[in-house]
């Protein structure tokens, strides 16, 4: 399996090359050159599998067994999911009035990113051990990615991780999950800015290809293909869990509602669709609605500011995985994708060509949800089911309630993806007039030592990041030389 840049100006790479990259050298994102097409018999067989086994089957298609033999691949995925709290890893909760919630948050940090990052970290370690290499991972987070990435690699001897978090823009628990990991290979920066602003120095560093190669830099944000690959399993599992039967001639459709920030889960769903999974996708966003405007009007343009909302992990204006979706729906047309993205980067405004907007509208529908609707949805779900939603999951369930209240019940099953547990967002739970449930391990974070380096407005964030990376490379080089002696 080969991977190509969405912008078409970088050499193709295998899975290992895509895994160890951030952006491609031409500024694009890696995508498979060809997507396998799944027939009905394969889908029927996969419908009998556990979530864990589904991930194994999907990864076997995209990793390349010459790189990771199947026996090793299975072992890595088993190890990745060994610390999840639910024996099934992912759990479907069936509530009243056709409300199906796929809980993706049973990992260590109570967020869906544990699923893809635990696997990605295992793949990294596999290649690093073989080659005796060191990498420095750079991650920008709006809340959940940072803690899941830290958790997946903390204590690793051949990985350093640098995380930039938006100070004051994520929940207190999210921040503590990052700043309380006081390990030699974990380096957390608190940025005086929002998640889009902290992405700028990261993108600037990755744009220096020689610097990236010299210091073995990589990203674990959802620009990393491995993240998107594992997230495809959410859609397959949601489909199989909500389909009454696959015995009919025409496979039934399931509607999957995807709360989205940077668009990794949405890109994964679009790829699953292209592979033959009969799902209808709905993207749910908060008031930072660039994806909603793109789907509805073809308007891929920045607003003046990122709006602070209760669904803070989705407070994003630049959903970079839309580039993957544009490329996919444009029929792998890298020339068109490159022209579109270069215009967006230049002007921060883009109107999709009519044919591309038409294809996007066919593949995806969308909904933008206010804070008021989020708290109302959280309250209603508790009242009807005694079930606590996180504010991000509530954006998906809000769409479900809109549809059921309209008096036109869906003729197809609907599954709402739940990306995080309500335990991470006590502030939002209280705003909904509900009582937070906080596990002992979360309460204990309050009393732990913290470590976080400030990145203040007026500081040169890019230079601070470069200096940190260079210092880590020097330290690793010193360790290797000492070991050799």
From Swiss-Prot:
Pfam families: PALP, Thr_synth_N. GO terms for biological process: 2-oxobutyrate biosynthetic process; serine family amino acid catabolic process. Its EC number is 4.2.3.-. SUPFAM superfamilies: Tryptophan synthase beta subunit-like PLP-dependent enzymes. The modification N6-(pyridoxal phosphate)lysine is found at residue 113. Keywords: Lyase, Pyridoxal phosphate. It comes from the Eukaryota. CDD domains: Thr-synth_2 (cd01560). It is an enzyme of class 4 (lyase). Transmembrane segments: none annotated. InterPro entries: Thr_synth_N (IPR029144), Thr_synth_N_sf (IPR037158), Thr_synthase-like (IPR004450), Threonine_Synthase (IPR051166), TrpB-like_PALP (IPR001926), TrpB-like_PALP_sf (IPR036052). Belongs to the threonine synthase family. This is Threonine synthase-like 2. It comes from Rattus norvegicus (Rat). The lineage of its organism: Eukaryota, Metazoa, Chordata, Craniata, Vertebrata.
């Amino acid at each position: 399996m080969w991977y190509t840049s969405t912008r078409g100006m970088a050499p193709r790479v295998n899975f290992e090359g895509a895994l160890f990259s951030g952006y491609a050298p031409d500024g694009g994102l890696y995508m498979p050159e060809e997507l396998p097409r799944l027939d009905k018999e394969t889908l029927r067989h996969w419908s009998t599998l556990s979530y864990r086994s589904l991930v194994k089957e999907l990864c076997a298609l995209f990793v390349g067994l010459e790189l990771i033999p199947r026996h090793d691949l299975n072992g890595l995925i088993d190890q990745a999911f060994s610390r999840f709290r639910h024996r099934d890893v992912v759990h479907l909760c069936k509530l009243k009035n056709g409300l199906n919630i796929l809980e993706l948050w049973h990992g260590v940090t109570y967020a869906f990113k544990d699923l893809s990052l635990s696997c990605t970290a295992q793949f990294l370690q596999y290649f690093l051990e073989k080659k005796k290499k060191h990498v420095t991972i750079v991650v920008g987070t709006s809340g959940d990615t940072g803690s899941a990435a830290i958790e997946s690699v903390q204590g690793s001897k051949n990985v350093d991780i640098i995380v930039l978090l938006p100070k004051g823009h994520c929940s207190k628990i999210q921040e503590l999950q990052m700043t309380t990991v006081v390990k030699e290979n974990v380096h957390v920066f608190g940025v005086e800015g929002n998640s889009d602003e902290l992405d700028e120095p990261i993108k600037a560093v990755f744009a220096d290809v020689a610097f990236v190669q010299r210091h073995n830099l990589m990203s674990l944000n959802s620009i990393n293909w491995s993240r998107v690959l594992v997230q495809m399993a959410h859609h397959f599992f949601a489909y199989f869990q909500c389909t009454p039967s696959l015995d009919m001639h025409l496979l039934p459709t399931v509607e999957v509602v995807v709360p989205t920030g940077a668009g990794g889960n949405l890109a994964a769903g679009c790829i699953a669709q292209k592979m033959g999974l009969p799902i209808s996708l709905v993207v749910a966003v908060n008031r930072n609605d660039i994806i909603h405007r793109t789907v509805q009007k073809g308007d891929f343009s920045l607003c003046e500011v990122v709006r602070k909302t209760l669904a803070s992990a989705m407070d994003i204006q630049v959903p970079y995985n839309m580039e993957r979706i544009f490329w996919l729906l444009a029929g792998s047309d890298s020339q068109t994708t490159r022209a579109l993205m270069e215009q967006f980067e230049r002007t921060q405004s883009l109107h999709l060509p009519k044919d591309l907007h038409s294809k996007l509208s066919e593949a995806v529908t969308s909904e933008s949800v206010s804070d008021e609707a989020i708290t109302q949805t959280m309250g209603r779900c508790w009242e009807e089911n005694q079930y606590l939603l996180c504010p991000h999951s509530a954006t998906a369930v809000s769409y479900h309630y809109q549809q059921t209240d309209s008096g036109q019940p869906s003729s197809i099953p609907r599954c709402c993806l739940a990306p995080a547990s309500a335990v991470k967002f006590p502030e939002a739970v209280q705003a909904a007039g509900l009582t937070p449930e906080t596990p002992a391990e979360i309460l204990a974070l309050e009393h732990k030592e913290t470590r976080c380096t400030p990145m203040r407005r007026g500081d040169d964030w890019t230079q601070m990041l470069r200096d940190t990376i260079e210092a880590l490379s020097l330290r690793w080089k010193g360790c290797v030389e000492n070991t050799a002696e």
